[in-house]
Amino acid sequence: MLRGAKVMKNIVFSILLSLVSAFAPMGVHAETPNHLDGVIDKYFKGKSLTKSDDITFDVAKRALDGTQVPFKFTANKKYKNISVVVEGNPHQLPGIGSLALTMHPKVAPFTFETNIRMEQDSYIDVIAEDDEGRFFYNQVAIRSAGGCSAGMIYDADAVLKEVGTMKVLQTETRASVFIKHPQHNGYQANLSNYTGLFILPEWHLSSVVVKDQEKEIWSAEFGGGSTSENPVFVFDSPKIKGNLQVLAVDTQGKQYIGK
């Protein structure tokens, strides 16, 4: 009897210890690995990158939902290309990280906000190229998990009915673009289909262009499906003169227009 009580006490102690470890402060956990060299070798091979404080972040260090991780950055100088790489995300191409998007802002400073998927604790790299071909970067570590391979209840009819639906909200200096799209990355399990397709094939936005009275504010190409389902793009711009026009294209070649 005493032996049984002792065993039970040890089990309870082990459970409590596991719970304490799970909710321990971030500083107690192992440091997030930095794979910047692998990212450079995969996407910017042969380029020399200089760290820059002109690229800043406004993010939470931990996100509870790996499928919807808020990510916001500001590029204070003018750059012709800005790439966002999630180092810890899988991708069909070999190497480190998933290139979430490459942007081409026409204004500076440029503040951009969206939600991304994260499969594991990871550094997010923002790598910018100026008009002279010089490359700069900054990075931030965020803790989250399970966002790329998480299963989902998938209603194909509902998705096809709403896909591409847009809403554009704007003030004179700030705008938000909402696009209905499943953003499948090729790793998600279809939990609602027990006899047919189990892994949902890759299907996500491939490009977006935002214009103000035919003058482009920014455009972007997307890769790897690291941008979250039903993406929202929030950005700042100098005085917006008219109603914004948005053209989005996905990996199936479908075009969607919003204004």
Region roles according to the model:
Residues 5-15:
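Bacterial N-terminal signal peptides that target proteins for export
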Residues 9-10, 27, 134-139:
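Short secondary-structure capping/junction motifs at helix and strand boundaries
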Residues 32-160, 164-171, 176-259:
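A general "mature secreted/periplasmic domain" signal
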Residues 24-30:
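Sec/Tat signal peptide C-region and signal peptidase I cleavage site
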Residues 14-24:
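Bacterial N-terminal signal peptides
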